[in-house]
């Protein structure tokens, strides 16, 4: 939430002029009149807290800074000049006179009237010489009386001494020593420049000071005569053209330079340096004066600084001790020497008696006269521009004559316009009078027309009423005759209507009896047609019902097979866990046997046993490895069997889904044939539309019946084929088991050869698998055991069952029943065992 409320547009010009109660204006030089005028137009801003209280000054100040509203001199509209037309000239003059320094800025905005008032309100400072006061007998009394009044002077002297230390003065001023009373006298003399009167005490007449003052006054008057000040405020910005006319002034420095034969640029540089030092000294004097004026409003009896009072007391005691005649003589000698130096340096006394000075003055006067003749009989337009009266008249004529011509043209146009306006007004008045007369005639004619039309309407009304009455009577008589005729006609039509109703009732009875007889005959005929159509429908739908029953029976068998496969899968998983446990046991035995072999090797080295005992131990190791390979082979066969059973379960599920869809399709076909049969019977047709049946089913009813008969035969032959395939599989399984038992016995056949045969049989099975189009193992790896023959034989069963299913399912391609699955990768345990056996043989 904002600290201040929104400012209205009418209050924007008042913001920044004044703050809350007791605030001062931004400018010191604004007068009382402008302040009064500004205070009337000011309006207090609406700034409140959420509780309704006014904001503090700090909050107002921060809010103004935040929103860009700041009390600055640029926003104080009461400051300025009284005449708005002279504002630009005033601003230009101030900008030309003002020096771009901080002190000049302060100096420009300090009202001299304020300093005068402050100096008048302060205590009068009495000028007193330290030497004369020391010699006088009443000096101590005057000092004791002046102690209470010296505190403002002491502060001023301190400020003056501080400024004197920082500024660079000439060697003459640096060699002098000032006392406190002399500093106060200097301040009093400076304050006299601001029209502050000094009233010294009566004392002995000092003619030297009077003569010095007269000489200075004479010098100033001569300077004013030689270099008169020319004011140039009439045409805008003040320029320095009049000051450049007399570049050589007969001052002390100029005369010294002429006598010393110094070049003009160097003399100008020296003059500038001295001018800068004089300005600095004047600034220090003004600063001291400002400090003195600043302390005048304080109590004169109170000491501002005790150290200053202590220094003044010490100096008084020191000066009281210097009352000897020697000091006075030295002081007088110094004063005389200084006066002699001043008289010698004053070259103006020799001004009119020195021929060189006169020659230089004549040369300067001639040069100035030549410069002035350039601007003779010319008017200064300001900014260094001088024009002759002829040029001014020419410029004025060039600027004013077009304006006068334009004025005359506009006056002529205005006169023509006035004449045209007068003519138009006269014509308008004439037309207005004519229109008014016409309106009056129209009104009178309208009144006459109204009366005549009213009379005519009355007469026409009477005649029309009489005509209407006569016509109405004739119409009534004519309508009465017509009504009598219509009544007679109505009686005749009523009698005819009664006779017609009787005739129609008799005809309706006869027609109803005939229709009842026809309906009975048609019902009997329809019943016969329905019985015949039902017989035909049963004959047509019999193969569909048979197919539906066969499909449901096959679905039940497939569900039973799936349950058997799931049971076999669980049994195989248990067997796989058992085999894995045995393999881990054999692995532990192998580790123990390895440790035992290591120990036996050590013992052989130590005891030197025979080769037979070593071979017997190695044969034990080989037997254990063979048992492990056997268990791993059984594990791989069980895993292959498990994968194959999973594949069988997936195929059975797919076939069950397919049978379900076929059952639904056959049901829909039966419903379709029944509906078509009903439609044909309703139409009275003996047969179904074979073309429509062919479009919907894809074949005619006769073809469909023949195809269903062949399917029934195939379904009847399927169980016998499956039994034969199962018997062949059992025989092959027994042969494989017998071979495994022979290989496991180890009599006359080493284990390594058995493992090699197993790998060969597994590779042979892999070559047969692509022929059967069922990918069971990983094609890239030839690391399968010998018992994969079982999976190959089982794949034959699957292919046979697939063929049987394809023969049963009509309208479905055999490729749609193929179920692709990712083959499982068996571990390379057999080859690892062979590698281990070969390593043992090498050892």
UniProtKB/Swiss-Prot annotation:
The keyword DNA-binding does not apply. The modification N-acetylserine is found at residue 2. It is found in: Cytoplasmic granule; Cell membrane. InterPro entries: Eisosome1. Transmembrane segments: none annotated. It is a peripheral membrane protein. The modification Phosphothreonine is found at residue 720. GO terms for biological process: eisosome assembly. It holds the Pfam family Eisosome1. Signal peptide: none annotated. Residues 13-44, 120-174, 717-843 are annotated as: Disordered. Residues 127-137, 163-174, 798-810 have a biased composition (Polar residues). Keywords: Acetylation, Cell membrane, Membrane, Phosphoprotein. Residues 781-797 have a biased composition (Basic and acidic residues). The keyword Membrane applies. The modification Phosphoserine is found at residues 2, 88, 130, 182, 401, 584, 710, 763, 775, 816, 828-829, 838. Belongs to the EIS1 family. This is Eisosome protein 1.
């Amino acid at each position: 939430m904002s600290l201040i409320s929104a400012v209205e547009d009418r209050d924007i010009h008042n913001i920044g002029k004044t703050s809350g109660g007791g605030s001062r204006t931004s400018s010191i030089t604004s007068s009382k009149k402008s302040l009064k005028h500004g205070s009337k137009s000011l309006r207090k801003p609406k700034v409140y807290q959420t509780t309704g209280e006014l904001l503090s000054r700090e909050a107002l100040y921060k809010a103004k800074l935040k929103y860009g509203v700041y009390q600055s001199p640029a926003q104080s509209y009461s400051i300025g000049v009284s005449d708005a037309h002279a504002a630009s000239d005033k601003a230009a003059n101030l900008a030309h006179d003002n020096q771009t320094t901080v002190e000049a800025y302060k100096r420009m905005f300090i009202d001299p009237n304020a300093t005068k008032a402050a100096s008048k309100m302060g205590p009068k400072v009495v000028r007193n010489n330290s030497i004369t006061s020391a010699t006088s007998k009443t000096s101590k009394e005057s000092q004791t009386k002046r102690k209470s009044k010296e505190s403002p002077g002491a502060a001023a002297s301190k400020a003056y001494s501080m400024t004197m230390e920082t500024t660079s003065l000439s060697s003459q001023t640096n060699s002098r020593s000032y006392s406190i009373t002399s500093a106060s006298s200097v301040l009093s003399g400076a304050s006299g420049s601001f029209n502050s009167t000094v009233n010294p005490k009566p004392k002995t007449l000092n003619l030297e000071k009077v003569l010095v003052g007269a000489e200075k006054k004479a010098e100033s008057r001569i300077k004013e005569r030689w270099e008169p000040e020319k004011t140039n405020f009439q045409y805008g910005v003040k320029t320095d053209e009049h000051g450049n006319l007399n570049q050589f002034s007969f001052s002390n420095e100029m005369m010294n330079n002429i006598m010393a034969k110094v070049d003009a640029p160097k003399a100008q540089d020296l003059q500038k340096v001295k001018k800068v030092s004089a300005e600095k000294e004047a600034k220090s004097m003004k600063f001291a004066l400002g400090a003195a004026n600043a302390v005048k409003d304080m109590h004169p009896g109170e000491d501002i600084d005790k150290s200053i009072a202590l220094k003044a007391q010490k100096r008084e005691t020191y000066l009281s001790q210097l009352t000897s005649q020697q000091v006075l003589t030295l002081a007088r000698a110094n004063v005389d020497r200084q006066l002699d130096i001043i008289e010698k340096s004053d070259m103006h006394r020799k001004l009119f008696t020195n021929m060189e000075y006169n020659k230089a003055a004549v040369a300067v006067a001639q040069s100035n006269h030549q410069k002035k003749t350039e601007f003779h009989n010319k008017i200064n337009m300001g900014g260094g521009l001088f024009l002759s009266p002829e040029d001014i008249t020419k410029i004025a004529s060039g600027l004013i004559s077009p304006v006068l011509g334009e004025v005359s043209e506009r006056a002529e146009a205005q006169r023509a316009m006035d004449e045209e306006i007068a003519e138009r007004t006269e014509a308008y008045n004439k037309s207005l009078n004519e229109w008014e007369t016409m309106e009056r005639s129209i009104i009178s004619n309208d009144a006459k027309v109204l009366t005549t039309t009213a009379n005519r309407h009355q007469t026409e009304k009477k005649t029309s009423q009489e005509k209407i009455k006569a016509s109405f009577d004739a119409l009534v008589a004519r309508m009465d005759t017509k009504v009598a005729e219509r009544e007679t006609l109505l009686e005749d039509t009523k009698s005819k209507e009664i006779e017609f109703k009787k005739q129609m009732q008799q005809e309706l009875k006869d027609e109803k009896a005939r229709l009842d007889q026809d309906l009975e005959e048609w019902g009997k005929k329809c019943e016969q047609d329905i019985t015949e159509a039902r017989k035909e429908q049963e004959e047509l739908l019999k193969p569909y019902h048979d197919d539906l029953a066969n499909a449901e029976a096959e679905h039940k068998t497939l569900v039973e097979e799936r349950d058997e496969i799931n049971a076999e899968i669980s049994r195989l998983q248990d067997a796989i866990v058992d085999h894995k446990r045995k393999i881990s046991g054999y692995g532990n035995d192998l580790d123990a046997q390895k440790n035992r072999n290591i120990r036996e090797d050590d013992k052989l080295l130590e005891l030197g046993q025979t080769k037979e005992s070593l071979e017997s131990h190695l044969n034990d190791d080989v037997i254990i490895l063979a048992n492990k390979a056997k268990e791993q082979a059984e594990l791989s066969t069980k895993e292959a069997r498990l994968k194959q059973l999973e594949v069988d379960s997936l195929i059975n599920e797919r076939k069950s889904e397919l049978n379900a869809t076929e059952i639904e399709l056959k049901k829909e076909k039966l419903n379709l044939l029944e509906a078509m049969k009903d439609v044909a019977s309703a139409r009275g047709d003996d047969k179904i539309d074979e073309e429509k049946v062919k479009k919907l089913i894809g074949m005619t009813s006769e073809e469909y019946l023949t195809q269903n008969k062949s399917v029934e035969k195939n379904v009847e032959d399927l169980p016998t084929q499956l039994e034969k395939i199962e018997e062949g599989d059992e025989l092959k399984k027994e042969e494989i088991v017998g071979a495994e038992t022979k290989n496991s016995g180890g009599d006359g056949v080493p284990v390594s050869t058995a493992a090699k045969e197993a790998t060969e049989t597994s590779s042979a099975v892999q070559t047969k698998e692509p022929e059967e189009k069922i990918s069971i193992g990983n094609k890239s790896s030839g690391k399968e055991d010998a018992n994969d023959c079982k999976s190959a034989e089982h794949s034959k069963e699957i292919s046979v069952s697939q063929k049987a299913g394809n023969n049963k399912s009509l309208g479905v391609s055999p490729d749609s029943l193929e179920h692709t699955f990712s083959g499982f990768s068996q571990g390379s345990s057999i080859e690892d065992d062979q590698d281990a056996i070969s390593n043992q043989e090498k050892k």
